[in-house]
Amino acid sequence: MRHDGPMHVQPGVGLQSDTSSSTGTGSGPADEPEAEKSAWGYLPPTAFRSRHSALSSIQQQTWERRWPQLGRQATAHSQPSARGHEPIDPIDARAWFGREAPVVLEIGCGSGTSTLAMAQAEPNVDVIAVEVYRRGLAQLLCAIDRADLQRINIRLIRGNGIDVLRDLIAPESLTGVRVFFPDPWPKARHHKRRLIQPSTVVLIADRLLPGGVFHAATDHPGYAEHIIAAGDAEPALARVDPGVDSLPVSVVRPTTKYEMKAHNAGSSINELIWKKQR
């Protein structure tokens, strides 16, 4: 999701319980991107700094009740895995959800409007929603409560999406990856901070099962071109037309308030979908 302010989460993550207060970040010391680059050999595409964000009393109560069951906190490792793209501590989705089902990872779920709607539409699919903002995750937990789902097929991770994808997701374990309206970082000098880079797409393709779907959406024409170039350059992926091609998970999204604002401002929405070749 597009974010309003800068934040930073170090690359390399594991899972632990979240012990942060309602105004805490739970992300540990925030290093400057250039220092991070010298340690890791690259500048993470999402070098943000986590901002403080107080929860309402209802959100705090829901967080305390629901998070231990549905949520995980991603924590920083000091060094990347020596195995390259191999995950450090892969999630056992079957154990976490309590069943065997297709798994979709949504990076940057925001307040979870699309997450919940798409999960409700496909109760046979399990969704892992990743977000750095605690308040957004708390809003999603409250929405899950209000929806009164017969079976909750959503789990939440608080952390940097690329790090979660790299360190917590096993190769060929996902049926889908969703990235809706990531920050376009429109200034040329900030393009290196864009979430979707060629290296990101390589990682996504590695984590997808054969036949799995990478679904991105943006209202920024320059970013759309950037995403298309990165997706089309990955030999394991082929762009598809959802109206023609058979897909294992839905690519029908709800229209969010942000999307309506973009539409009213005259922006076109670019739906970009690739399928991993068998």
From Swiss-Prot:
Pathway: tRNA modification; N(7)-methylguanine-tRNA biosynthesis
EC number of this enzyme: 2.1.1.33
Alphabetized InterPro entries for the sequence: SAM-dependent_MTases_sf, tRNA_(Gua-N-7)_MeTrfase_Trmb, tRNA_methyltr_TrmB_bact
GO molecular function: tRNA (guanine(46)-N7)-methyltransferase activity
Positions of the UniProt region annotated as Disordered: 1-42
Keywords: Methyltransferase, S-adenosyl-L-methionine, Transferase, tRNA processing
Pfam families: Methyltransf_4
Superkingdom as given in the UniProt entry: Bacteria
Catalytic activity: guanosine(46) in tRNA + S-adenosyl-L-methionine = N(7)-methylguanosine(46) in tRNA + S-adenosyl-L-homocysteine
Record flagged with keyword Oxidoreductase: no
GO cellular-component term (any): tRNA methyltransferase complex
Active site, renumbered: D183
Known role: Catalyzes the formation of N(7)-methylguanine at position 46 (m7G46) in tRNA.
Family in the record: Belongs to the class I-like SAM-binding methyltransferase superfamily. TrmB family.
Protein name, as recorded: tRNA (guanine-N(7)-)-methyltransferase
